[in-house]
């Protein structure tokens, strides 16, 4: 935000690490090493296309990490693919609930949605939030609003301990608010 323009889009794939790489993830390193670069983690190729359209109009650099299983999924292509935008820094609530907030991104979103549906069958109402963008992170503080409603949160990803999950928790608990709007402590 210092006024310098750096319109650059870096496209790569990630998530769902396999083989000898299954125990490693670069997300923790990326979010700590690339400050000033938008780090975007779409859950599917439609969302990725929206990020590309958004970043093509931006003067800021962006790293778009496409999920590997997104290449294999059949998706309904939007009729406005060239105009479709995915906003940077804005989370998307993909399932509303009242008992627990599940926060995730990228390829784990499908797994979390399946788990939320299984929880619902057991009488537990889970709200699912797709972060979509690690940097910037939840600029509208929607995760805190959800936690205020459910009083419980679980952060889910495939990163190593201390990586993106720790980053998301720190962003929500320390930087966004340690109290919700009702003055109740968020733990």
What would you call each of these model-derived segments?
Residues 1-101, 110, 126:
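Conserved thiamine diphosphate
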Residues 3-6, 68-187:
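Thiamine diphosphate
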């Amino acid at each position: 935000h210092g006024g310098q323009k750096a319109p650059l889009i870096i496209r790569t794939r990630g998530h769902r690490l396999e083989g000898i790489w299954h125990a490693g993830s670069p997300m923790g390193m990326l979010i700590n090493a690339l400050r000033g670069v938008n780090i975007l983690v779409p859950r599917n190729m439609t969302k990725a296309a929206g990020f590309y359209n958004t970043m093509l109009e931006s003067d800021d650099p962006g790293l778009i990490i496409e999920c590997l299983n997104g290449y294999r999924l059949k998706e309904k292509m939007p009729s406005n693919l060239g105009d479709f935008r995915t906003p940077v820094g804005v989370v998307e609530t993909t399932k509303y609930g009242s008992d627990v907030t599940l926060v995730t991104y990228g390829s784990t979103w499908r797994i979390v949605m399946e788990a939320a549906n299984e929880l619902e069958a057991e009488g537990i109402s889970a709200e699912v939030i797709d972060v979509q963008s690690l940097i910037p992170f939840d600029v509208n503080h929607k995760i805190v609003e959800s936690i205020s409603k459910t009083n419980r949160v679980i952060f889910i990803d495939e990163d190593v301990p201390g990586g993106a999950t720790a980053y998301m928790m720190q962003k929500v608990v320390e930087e966004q608010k340690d109290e919700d709007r009702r003055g109740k402590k968020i733990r």
